[in-house]
């Protein structure tokens, strides 16, 4: 075509793109006719330079523009590969290049083309020449466009792939609004050698024009689908940064290209047939040539990488470096092409450094490539670095990778707008935001490559593609969770660049925080450890592993670290609790094990703990602020975790003031700084006087003031078994707690009461052992045995029985302190007997049938009954008439059979144990009563060594026989056998004394008269009798106490 020079027309321009092949005369004449018929249109003025033959247009494109139709048109008439004629234009410093894309989609040919072709990429080749009749006189050589892109794998975001080319919004017109309803376009391709000029650009010819893109007309509607909602002005700061750029806004709804001042270069265009484009657009195979590149809207640092022919997926340039390089390029009048994207009022700012491309893996590339055909992406894959320099191609795989990534990071528009705007504004004050996208990370060159799933790719999204993205939204979110590395690499940079990054906040909230341990801080004023009192130097920190207490003693600052595995108990005493202490601050209490004191001493670097006294085990912290319920619950949770780790289950339960005070109440003020500084002044406890402290704690001491005494007790009465019991306890409105009597010991009763001799005194302390779970002491045992034989046993049985004191057997078997005996010739049995010989000076035990000996061994009570000690062998007698019913009842228990009450005695028979069982089973055989000398062992637990006990008793009887009867008699296993009949057993570890008393009581009620073997006593008494025995004994003592009080008062 001929070179013409036309004046600049502000509102009309047209670019005619022709293939680099010979055109027929009819085609040329048609173009000349069109140009001559419309003098206001743009005329091509500069010849196009030759393009490389290896790069071809994939379809013939004819870019036309009319005054009213400012849309893209594609010429389908030329089906052959035609190489167009070069056209050049002269440079003019006063004019800018303007490229207007004429739409022919609304013609029959355009509609047909739109219906026939799928949404694939338009492919441009180096041979394509784009010319404009409105180009100024500047000669632009080698307007390079991007390589041909395979249709299936390309992104939909066409306008997002060329940031250096700015398209003016055409949605303001009716035709533009109709584009939204049409299917979205796929990504266009530009070749490195395609160059484009617009009258909006200045006429300076410096560098090569780049980033031109062919738009597929049946998909170009999406270019402005979002554009109607965005600003139509070019970033003001961008114009300041590019000193030679002349940015101008078209007032009409046409599409404009903003191109930096460049040196005169050839503007070539070429095309191929439309059928070839259609065939390639339907191709499903993924093929990439090294000369192709996909244009992605990225930052200037990425453009510089692309210019240097380095893959974008392998590194990310530094932000500072990028900005510096950008300024340098602008000062050198480097040619830069900006594609204004008319979507969502976003315009590219050349200074934006936060736009990052990422490095996708091969596996991700395969997975994401299926979405590429639905994405429209703008890329500034090429950019000139200095004057006269030409852009170079980049690996097409890099672009394809970038395209695939955008689908993963794509969110809905509301999320994108909300997240992107504050980030962009944080970097560019006063600048308008670019196209909205979700910035996953912000990184720099020095940080190295980042994962593709968090790349910050600015993109367009069609309605149809939006549906696909929404379906994969959950996949994108899960992908973010799998990339903790991204967050780590970018959190530092984003914090430096962005004052607020909601994306990082969202990602950090998604990341699990299971590594964080429970931690609680308290502000405290003082700490008390043994003799030390320290002032606070911070907060006490409590975790599962340690407790850190920073404090100061004199001029020494100490940070005590207590290992929680050595904690025994803890307590939190609020000021409102335990009003007896009158505390104004809460106290945090820790009790550590004694073996940890050495470690505490080492940390304190103090010789105060050299003695390792008991007071050093307690750590008291006086808190400054009241403890909230939330802090209290969190403290219990921490202690529960510690108790699980250390195995101290009691640690999970806090000690109350009443429970913890006995631990340190005996400490003097010299031993414990807490007693000296705190308790003495706050609680008014007399220092060093444990009894007075205890009296103050229990409110037992008399009031020190002159106020009227407020009643702190109440009377309780109880009726049981026809008897009344009276007790005193605290008021119901007071805090109920266990109270141990700490006053003077008071004698309640003497039994038997005077004037009977040998009375036994029972005090209030003895009543405590009658509580459930307590062992009965010897006083209660002796008292009740005396009570039984005096009150419960019959006179006949009393004459035949004798009960030793519970101290008898202990005295008999005790070890002698004096090793030298008066008579060394005495045997061991004689020595033992000598210890208790006075116990029977007024009684002859050999005149008794039953001798009861309470035995206590290893805190276990059981009963030994010496039966018929005066007999040398078993004797069978007739049942006495008076005891026939009792004996028959006993036999029914022994044999588990019933015997008639009117059973008559028969002649005396000497039967063995086996014969006795057979005669018992036969009702017609007459029965005899057996009196057998033996030692019965009635044990409810069978935990004692009964053989030693039996042997000791045999030896005692042998010596006692010699003393009393002055003859020798041997008590052996044959003539004094030991028997252990089956008796009711205890079901706990504390009722052995109760069972002993019940054995004696049952014996007196139902004595054993027939000692024929075997003796069965399993059903001697019901179990419920044992359950009430303690309370019965208590009531008995209180009843006797009241009786004796009345008797003494009268």
Curated annotation (Swiss-Prot):
Changing residue 779 to E: Reduces deconjugation activity. Residues 196-211 have a biased composition (Low complexity). Residues 259-271, 310-320 have a biased composition (Polar residues). GO terms for biological process: antiviral innate immune response; protein desumoylation; proteolysis. Keywords: Cytoplasm, Hydrolase, Immunity, Innate immunity, Phosphoprotein, Protease, Thiol protease, Ubl conjugation pathway. InterPro entries: Papain-like_cys_pep_sf (IPR038765), Peptidase_C48_C (IPR003653), Sentrin-specific_protease (IPR051947). GO terms for molecular function: SUMO-specific endopeptidase activity. Residues 273-288, 321-331, 338-365, 449-469 have a biased composition (Basic and acidic residues). Pfam families: Peptidase_C48. Protease that acts as a positive regulator of the cGAS-STING pathway by catalyzing desumoylation of CGAS. Desumoylation of CGAS promotes DNA-binding activity of CGAS, subsequent oligomerization and activation. Deconjugates SUMO2 and SUMO3 from targeted proteins, but not SUMO1. Catalyzes the deconjugation of poly-SUMO2 and poly-SUMO3 chains. Has very low efficiency in processing full-length SUMO proteins to their mature forms. It comes from the Eukaryota. The active site is at 860, 939, 992 (nucleophile). Residues 760-1050 are annotated as: Protease. The keyword Oxidoreductase does not apply. Residues 1-28, 183-288, 304-365, 443-476 are annotated as: Disordered. Its EC number is 3.4.22.-. It is an enzyme of class 3 (hydrolase). Belongs to the peptidase C48 family. This is Sentrin-specific protease 7. The modification Phosphoserine is found at residues 11-13, 25, 373, 433, 443-444. It is found in: Cytoplasm. It comes from Homo sapiens (Human). GO terms for cellular component: cytoplasm; nucleus; postsynaptic cytosol; presynaptic cytosol.
